[in-house]
Regions:
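Glycine-rich nucleophile elbow surrounding the catalytic serine of serine-hydrolase chemistry
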Residues: 205-217
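Alpha/beta-hydrolase-fold catalytic nucleophile elbow
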Residues: 204, 229-230, 309
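Alpha/beta-hydrolase-fold serine-hydrolase catalytic core, especially in secreted/extracellular enzymes
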Residues: 18-104, 273-383
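Bacterial Sec-dependent N-terminal signal peptides
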Residues: 1-25
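Alpha/beta-hydrolase fold nucleophile elbow
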Residues: 195-207
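Mobile cap/lid helix-loop segments that gate and shape the active-site cleft of serine hydrolases
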Residues: 223-263, 268, 275-288, 294-300
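Cap/lid segment of the alpha/beta-hydrolase catalytic domain
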Residues: 115-192, 231-242, 247
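Loop/turn elements at helix/coil->beta-strand transitions in domains of secreted/extracellular proteins
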Residues: 118-120, 150-153, 197-200, 221-225, ...
């Protein structure tokens, strides 16, 4: 009976949306809020076996939809790490490595100054933003530096087309595939660093970085803790080609949404951060209960949490970061007391926000490698 209703509702969604979008692309507010809730009601499962069958289908369509059934050849070149800056309790270094032959990931590596026997590793994909762009923004620098001061090794890298990643435009047709490859290779890079505890690896990002967070976590079990911020929505599918520009949500009668994709994190610890000013406004009543049910199928309902800030907007602001710090400390065994004041509140004051020029990877002394493939057309051929 549920299958019948899924076919009916699928036909309704298609009729309602196909005139304005390609038939198998679900972009932006593809569903209405009511449709998003109805979809979750109809796809909710009552057994672990049923969910694992569904999750296998979802993972397969993500890979098929972004044409990533297999990863491209892994380059043999070594990562370049230089430009170390010693800060208050942490250091920052510039990083360049190939994610596939001819394409370079660019970013910054934040490390704690205090020596430890092993280190948690945290990936910090960033969201869309200008003046400055993603990894140079205050909220991103504070997030990365504070996590490093808590004892983690943190890597933040550029979205394609932003920062130092200027080999193609951000809105290139296969940006979703390229960014997913970059995310997986960033995980490879972080995991390869000396002292990284592979059982303490996490990912957290906001907006488009939230999309990168839950897609990476869905596809790669090496991510043990996930904190997608202001992105998981029953009705909103991501408004950029880097999130929804390839058919990962729909094929024929098959349909999913980002709530189901985020649910693939189960039973690993996950914190959903939501607010009242964007498409996550319904999280406590719609998205969170659905994901709780999935975790409950594993007997791990305690490992999924939601912090909802009804009076806040779409960002990774201080209160959202505060919630994330506590969650990361809990599950990655980080030292949150080392960054807290006498009242127990996280103090980001020691973090110095640097100018973009201080975090830039490429300059006259460190030019872009000569084998870098340039231009959308050339990058599309690589993909």
């Amino acid at each position: 009976m549920k299958t019948f209703f899924l076919l009916i509702i699928g036909a309704f969604f298609l009729a309602d949306n196909c005139c304005s979008q390609s038939a198998e692309l679900c972009q932006g507010a593809y569903f209405t809020e009511a449709q998003g809730k109805t979809f979750l009601d109809l796809t909710s499962v009552t057994s672990r076996g049923a969910w694992e069958a569904r999750s296998a289908t979802i993972k397969n369509q993500i890979r098929e939809g972004m044409q990533l059934q297999t990863m491209p050849a892994k380059p043999t070149s070594k990562p370049i790490i230089n430009g170390k800056r010693v800060m208050d309790g942490y250091s920052i270094e510039n990083v360049v490595f190939e994610s596939m032959p001819g394409f370079y990931v660019t970013g910054n590596l934040y490390r704690p100054l205090k020596k430890q026997r092993s280190y948690a590793g945290i990936l910090c994909p960033h969201g869309h933003g200008d003046n400055p762009e993603g990894r140079f923004r205050e909220q991103t620098q504070k997030r990365c530096a504070t996590l490093a001061r808590m004892g983690a090794v943190v890597f933040v890298w550029d979205m394609v087309g932003q920062g130092d990643s200027k080999q193609c435009e951000h809105k290139m047709a296969k940006a979703l595939k390229l960014q997913t490859i970059n995310s997986i290779r960033s995980l490879d890079f972080l995991s390869s660093l000396p002292g990284i505890d592979k059982n303490r690896i996490a990912a957290t990002g906001e907006s488009g970085g939230g999309t990168q967070t839950f897609i990476l976590t869905a596809l790669d079990d090496r991510v043990k803790v996930s904190v997608p911020a202001v992105m998981v929505s029953a009705y909103f599918f991501g408004g950029c080609v880097c999130e929804s520009g390839m058919p990962i949500h729909k094929k024929g009668d098959y349909q999913t949404n980002n709530v189901e994709i985020a649910s693939l994190t189960a039973p690993r610890p996950m914190l959903l951060i939501s607010d009242g000013g964007d498409w996550t406004k319904n999280t406590p009543k719609v998205e969170y209960p659905f994901i709780q049910n999935v975790y409950n199928l594993y007997g791990k309902k305690n490992l999924i949490e939601n912090v909802h800030l009804p009076d806040e907007k779409h960002d990774y602001g201080p209160s959202k970061r505060k919630a994330m710090y506590a969650f990361m400390a809990k599950y990655l065994k980080l030292d949150i007391k080392s960054v807290s004041d006498a009242s127990g509140n996280v103090d980001e004051g020691p973090v110095k926000v640097l100018d973009q020029k201080d975090l830039t990877v490429f300059d006259e002394q460190h030019p872009r490698p000569s084998n870098a493939v340039m231009g959308d057309e050339a990058i599309m051929k690589l993909l």
